[in-house]
Amino acid sequence: MQGRLSAWLAKHQLAHRPLGFDYQGIEILQIRPQDWPSIAVALYVYGFNYLRSQCAYDVTPGGGLASVYHLTKVQDDADQPEEVCIKIFVSREDPRIPSVFWIWKSSDFQERESYDMFGIIYESHPRLKRILMPESWIGWPLRKDYIVPNFYELQDAY
């Protein structure tokens, strides 16, 4: 099912895949990582001037990873602002997605958290480093295939 934004992107020949709507009627689009920079700029020009949230998740154990962006079109006279959910799927072996820090500054800490927990590399992010875990931490704690270090091994490390 194609929504209004998907039709607009198709009209402008921007590659995407409509995934339907969520329970609130928000359109969900899948974007390939290599298409994300140009589509992000197009969405900003379209009016999506606010990145409400960015998160990531592990799709399946040993499978792919996903980065999710929730964008909102904030206007003075809008009591029901238009929203869209963008999903970008990457392989676990090479989890690279272009950063949108240069478009939405609010993605700074959010992309860093996704990097810290899942190991997704946001290319061209100005400060991509761990934000929650110590710099010396090994692995990506929220991946489904993550093996938790033995508590006593960690205790001995301090």
Curated annotation (Swiss-Prot):
InterPro entries named among the record's database cross-references: NADH_DH_suC, NADH_quin_OxRdtase_su_C/D-like, NADH_UbQ_OxRdtase_30kDa_su, NADH_UbQ_OxRdtase_CS
Enumerate the SUPFAM superfamilies for this protein: Nqo5-like
Name the enzyme group at the top EC level: translocase
Query: Major location, coarse class?
Result: plastid
Q: What is its EC number?
A: 7.1.1.-
Sorted UniProt keywords: Chloroplast, Membrane, NAD, NADP, Plastid, Plastoquinone, Quinone, Thylakoid, Translocase, Transport
One Pfam family name from the record? Complex1_30kDa
Catalysed reactions, as listed in the record: a plastoquinone + NADH + (n+1) H(+)(in) = a plastoquinol + NAD(+) + n H(+)(out); a plastoquinone + NADPH + (n+1) H(+)(in) = a plastoquinol + NADP(+) + n H(+)(out)
Name the Gene Ontology biological process terms.
photosynthesis, light reaction
Subcellular location(s) of the protein: Plastid, Chloroplast thylakoid membrane
GO terms (molecular function) for this protein are: NADH dehydrogenase (ubiquinone) activity; quinone binding
Membrane topology classification: Peripheral membrane protein
Which GO cellular component term is one of those annotated? Answer: chloroplast thylakoid membrane
| Similarity field | Belongs to the complex I 30 kDa subunit family.
Entry function: NDH shuttles electrons from NAD(P)H:plastoquinone, via FMN and iron-sulfur (Fe-S) centers, to quinones in the photosynthetic chain and possibly in a chloroplast respiratory chain. The immediate electron acceptor for the enzyme in this species is believed to be plastoquinone. Couples the redox reaction to proton translocation, and thus conserves the redox energy in a proton gradient.
Q: Which NCBIfam families match?
A: PRK12494.1
Q: How does it assemble?
A: NDH is composed of at least 16 different subunits, 5 of which are encoded in the nucleus.
Q: What is this protein called?
A: NAD(P)H-quinone oxidoreductase subunit J, chloroplastic
Record organism: Angiopteris evecta
Q: Which gene encodes it?
A: ndhJ
